[in-house]
Amino acid sequence: GPGTKTPPGQLLVLGDEYMQKKAVSLQKVLLVRSVLTMAIADALTAVLDSKYTYFVRRPFMMDPSLITIMPTPNHPSYPAGHSTLSTAGATVLKYYFPEDKDMWEAKAYEAGMSRIWGGIHYMMDHEAGVIMGGKVGQA
């Protein structure tokens, strides 16, 4: 939820802070928040279904000598959840605030890549998550 370190929490906080800074009308805030929350929920459903369909092991599972720099989730690697959820959220936010599309894309990219840099995902996980998240966000 809002205020947590998870992708849904971060997306909601980023969206709220942005809309407050831009003095967006209450009507638009409610609309954007509703669509953003639905996109996050749909992306989570899609990514978890795919993770357990493909059941790709995480890098540290394949190479026990690999030391990760962040906590490692206990679910399959592919596709990357952070990439999927962040891209879905960024796609929604780009739709409503196209003037800052580059910023939303950069935030989603960084969220997804952080999991590769942390040693818990492969690049293919991120790439698939970006594709999936983009499609969910457009739906």
What are the residue ranges of the model-derived segments?
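Hydrophobic alpha-helical bundle signature of multipass membrane enzymes
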Residues: 1-139
